[in-house]
């Protein structure tokens, strides 16, 4: 059973600008469907059962272009998402995102990841539109 999905999108903006926007957790609610609110330490995650408060750790390295999020849920389970901004030709960037399966019971894993893959594809388009506007 697959436990991850990798997606990427080209963004017609310089790497530093794309990185700065994505690395700021306060911007997560603007381009994702998953976050109702977010800051440097916590977030409110939107789930099918309503909003859930979580601890959010953003690990960002401008030098490496990496932005990773570690999410700790009220029950102590931990989820993660890993991403990277890479320079492309000219003043463009490539944003790649490794979507990890959510910390859910095994019987729900495949459906949850499939649903999140579709959502991520939409979110990446939203991110590009927002940054290129």
Model-derived regions, located:
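Hydrophobic/aromatic beta-strand elements that line small-molecule binding cavities or substrate pockets
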Residues: 7-9, 54-60, 71, 79-87
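Residue-level recognition of beta-strand termini and adjacent short loop/turns
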Residues: 39-42, 89
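Short strand-connecting beta-turns/loops that link adjacent beta-strands
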Residues: 14, 50, 63-64, 74, ...
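Intrinsic-disorder/low-complexity, polar/charged segments enriched in Ser/Thr/Lys/Arg/Asp/Glu/Gln
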Residues: 2-8, 53, 66, 78-80, ...
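Hydrophobic ligand-binding cavity/cleft-lining segments
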Residues: 1-38
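Beta-strand/loop substructures that line and gate deep hydrophobic ligand-binding cavities in soluble
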Residues: 73-133
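Short beta-strand segments that buttress and anchor functional surface loops
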Residues: 43-49, 67-74
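Hydrophobic pocket/interface hotspot
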Residues: 17-22, 28, 58, 69, ...
